[in-house]
Curated annotation (Swiss-Prot):
PANTHER family: UDP-3-O-ACYL-N-ACETYLGLUCOSAMINE DEACETYLASE 1, MITOCHONDRIAL-RELATED
Binding, Zn(2+): H78, H237, D241
Protein name: UDP-3-O-acyl-N-acetylglucosamine deacetylase
BP GO terms, sorted: lipid A biosynthetic process
Cell inner membrane listed as a keyword: no
Species for this entry: Acinetobacter baumannii (strain AYE)
Gene3D superfamilies the record matches: lpxc deacetylase, domain 1 (3.30.230.20), lpxc deacetylase, domain 2 (3.30.1700.10)
Family: Belongs to the LpxC family.
Record has Signal as a keyword: no
Taxonomy of the source species: Bacteria, Pseudomonadati, Pseudomonadota, Gammaproteobacteria, Moraxellales
Length: 300
């Protein structure tokens, strides 16, 4: 049986909030069977839990925020991507502020931290959401589409007319597994244009942004001295974001995802469109690991 998984032990770390620029504590806590992914604001008294649910997402500036009432947890997509990449079903993510720390702008540090906690199988079948027919979300020329597929394939295309974005590196395809995610996707960093930074900081946004946690792009190219980690790092990061956004459906998805210039808002709309019609999907489990179309890292 393909089983649900959580962590073996608590892991604690800290980092800088992208928008606040302040230190944020983050703790990963093992959770119970069918508990799902839950974000917990421990800076509040009493602490407030917000489940990682697509219907609780509100888009802020270039990130996904979970919101309940007037309480939010922002910039969740990179840690959600790491959680999905390792196939973790049940986890409590404690944060000491209204946003998850940005770390280095990728999912890599979260992969490292979660692996420090160790993966533990739980005595319950892992649930998957199998897409049964095409579902799409469209905004202007942007699109996000699910199609039936025996696995989880992500195809993404960005479209930037800019010297830093070589045309041959604006599309990428990933057949999702823990191995491909960790080695081909998780280290891809977020990116932004230097010309936007002064405006953002003047409006109390991106106060924690730096070349230590993002790829900076000016009028001619990449500003970071070390350059890119991959020739197609920009589009790989969009795939990273999509993996995190799509995991808000509650379970690993079995489908093909095609994104063209898609972002957090459109990815979320796609999930809402899936949920709007129960005939779009079914919940499946696998009694034999050989039948599972998505390979995960083994739990030892």
């Amino acid at each position: 049986m393909v089983k649900q998984r959580t962590l073996n032990r608590v892991v604690k770390a800290s980092g800088i909030g992208l928008h606040s620029g302040q230190k944020v504590m983050i703790n990963f806590i093992p959770h119970t069977v069918d508990g799902g992914i839950v974000f917990r604001r421990i800076d509040l008294d009493p602490p407030v839990d917000i489940p990682a649910n697509a219907l609780l997402i509100q888009e802020a500036f270039m990130c996904s925020n979970l919101v309940t009432g007037d309480i939010k947890v922002g910039t969740i997509e990179h840690v959600m991507s790491a959680i999905a990449g390792l196939g973790i079903d049940n986890l409590i993510v404690e944060v000491s502020a209204s946003e998850v720390p940005i770390m280095d702008g990728s999912a890599g540090p979260f992969i490292y931290l979660l692996m420090q906690g160790g993966l533990r199988e739980q005595d319950a079948p892992k649930k998957f959401i199998k897409i049964l027919k095409p579902v799409e979300a469209l905004i202007d020329d942007k699109k996000a589409i699910f199609s039936p597929h025996n696995g989880f394939q992500l195809n993404f295309t960005i479209d930037f007319d800019h010297p830093a974005f070589a045309k041959e590196y604006q599309s990428a395809t990933i057949d999702f597994s823990t191995e491909t995610f960790v080695y081909e996707v998780s280290e891809a960093r977020t990116f932004g244009f230097m010309k936007d930074l002064d405006y953002l900081k003047a409006n109390n946004l991106a106060l924690g942004a730096s070349l230590d946690n993002a790829i900076g792009v000016d009028d001619t190219g990449v500003v970071n001295e070390e350059g890119l980690r991959f020739a197609d790092e920009f589009v790989r990061h969009k795939i990273l974001d999509a993996v995190g956004d799509l995991y808000l459906l509650g379970h690993q998805i079995i489908a093909k995802f095609d994104g063209y210039k898609s972002g957090h808002a459109l990815n979320n709309q796609l999930l809402r469109n899936v949920q709007s019609d129960p005939s779009n999907y079914e919940i499946v489990t696998f009694d034999d690991e050989k039948d599972c179309p998505i390979p995960y890292v083994s739990v030892t």
